[in-house]
Amino acid sequence: MSSLYPLTFQPIFKERVWGARNLERLYGKKLPAAVPIGESWEISDRPGDVSVIANGPLAGKDLHWLVENHRVDLLGDAKLEAGRFPLLIKLLDAQEKLSLQVHPPASKAAELRGDPKTEMWFIADAIPNAELY
């Protein structure tokens, strides 16, 4: 039987010039004062940005520790790239156009020592006449 339970994580906030403050209103996030927050990383196991468990007996442990110590309970027999949790889940709050982003295919990303990135978006809120392209 698994020793895991429903986990919550401390968000990792990212200041962005195109960000805003709507994550407070929409999700009750307690944002750092007086800066535009463009991203709230909800689950991350990226070097330098690893989510920390916020609740229960494992509070204070990070997601990478969880993957190393409870891999099967957490992920079953899923294959891991570089031994890290396979998803980066974040909320974006963009009040301006986002900076240009280029996501190369996996082969090119590996050549450049980067990560491939397949994205899925869900639009939770938008102002009238907002655009996505």
Model region roles, listed by residue range:
Residues M1-Y133:
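Transition-metal
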